Amino acid sequence: MGKITDRVEDLAQPIVESQGLELVDVEYVKEGENRVLRVFIENPEGEVTLDHCENVSKNLDEKLDEVDPIQESYILEVSSPGIERPLKKKEDFDRFSGKLAYIKTFAPVSGNKEITGIIKGRDGDNIKVLKKDDDKELEIPFSQIAKAHLMVDFDNITG
């Protein structure tokens, strides 16, 4: 299924960028009897609006109909990535430095395959994270990250 998401990313990228938005991620999953194509977008200037989602959805739907990279029927969903935004690119770890994240690695890093901690940026291809449970700083090779996303830091919510 990775090839479908790669092809959709290639089609979606110029559509999303033409509206001043950023493409965060593309997922193609089976949910029950349905296949769902999810496209996550972000507005670097602020919030993603319903108009943003509708415009990207309409333009991408037209492009997908034209190119037809997916043979079976599917549901197209376009939305913001939400509060647990995926961290997919090295630059995401620079942008979200100081934020709480969950990181799962392919192989253990200092004995851990699952790490929750504060992103401290990166050093070249290594992501620096201050582990939440013991305040130990780890350097994780970007190539070893299987999955990563932001988390809500309930300990630092004020109100």
UniProtKB/Swiss-Prot annotation:
InterPro entries: Ribosome_maturation_RimP (IPR003728), RimP_C (IPR028998), RimP_C_sf (IPR036847), RimP_N (IPR028989), RimP_N_sf (IPR035956). It holds the Pfam family RimP_N. GO terms for cellular component: cytosol. Gene3D superfamilies: Ribosome maturation factor RimP, C-terminal domain, RimP-like superfamily, N-terminal. One of its GO terms (biological process) is translation. It is found in: Cytoplasm. SUPFAM superfamilies: YhbC-like, C-terminal domain, YhbC-like, N-terminal domain. The keyword Kinase does not apply. PANTHER family: RIBOSOME MATURATION FACTOR RIMP. Required for maturation of 30S ribosomal subunits. This is Ribosome maturation factor RimP. It comes from Halothermothrix orenii (strain H 168 / OCM 544 / DSM 9562). The lineage of its organism: Bacteria, Bacillati, Bacillota, Clostridia, Halanaerobiales. The gene is rimP.
